[in-house]
A protein has these predicted regions:
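Class I S-adenosyl-L-methionine
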Residues: 1-113, 120-121, 141-143, 156
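Conserved beta-strand segments of the P-loop GTPase G domain that flank and frequently precede/overlap
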Residues: 5-6, 136, 160
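Active-site-proximal loop->helix
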Residues: 124-128, 148-150
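Short, structured loop/turn "capping" segments at alpha-beta junctions
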Residues: 129-134
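A short, charged helix-loop
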Residues: 135-148
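Conserved anion/nucleotide-ligand pocket segment
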Residues: 145-165
């Protein structure tokens, strides 16, 4: 089973206890590079606090920034029955890596643990309901649809971006 765990803006510090238990038990841990940077120091701190046994090695760490490069390692872990965790931002099934995983792996091999997404948190900060907002994702996508979305003059338009946009 691949446990796909959403994180909020707090990263590892924002995970709930059941998700932390899955991370501690993982033999393969896949995450964006920004979260991977936190993992080794976090692992050592968990060992120092006695939440992970002192002799327990840090799991295999793999960056998910280019998802096509993780599939082989995930397939091997699943075939061998090794505990595997993939950390993602927010809700992995909302404009996230979850769609790609479902295209590649049977749903029975995936379990999703969503966290609030960035736009959900933004609307909460604004004190605005978000069910009537229009959404567009430019994350790794062509920005051309943004112009068409803006021409429709929605009352609220939320735009997901990535570091290059």
């Amino acid at each position: 089973m691949l446990e796909v765990i959403g994180t909020d803006a707090g990263g590892l510090a924002g995970l709930v206890p059941p998700s932390l238990a899955l991370v501690r038990a993982a033999e393969l841990l896949v995450a964006p590079a920004r979260l991977l940077a936190e993992l080794e120091p976090w692992w050592r701190a968990e060992q120092a606090a006695g939440r992970i046994s002192a002799g327990s090695p840090c799991p295999q760490l793999l960056a998910s920034d280019r998802p096509e490069l993780i599939f082989g390692a995930v397939e091997q872990a699943l075939a061998a029955g090794r505990p595997a965790v993939l950390l993602a931002s927010g809700d992995p099934l909302w404009f996230g890596i979850g769609r790609l995983l479902l295209q590649r792996f049977p749903a029975a091999q995936l379990r999703f643990h969503p966290a609030p997404c960035s736009l959900q948190l933004a609307f909460a900060r604004l004190g605005r309901p978000w069910q009537d907002a229009s959404w567009i994702s430019l994350h790794g996508r062509d920005p051309e649809p943004l112009a068409a979305a803006l021409q429709k003059r929605p009352s609220a338009l939320a735009v997901l971006t990535d570091p290059s946009r």
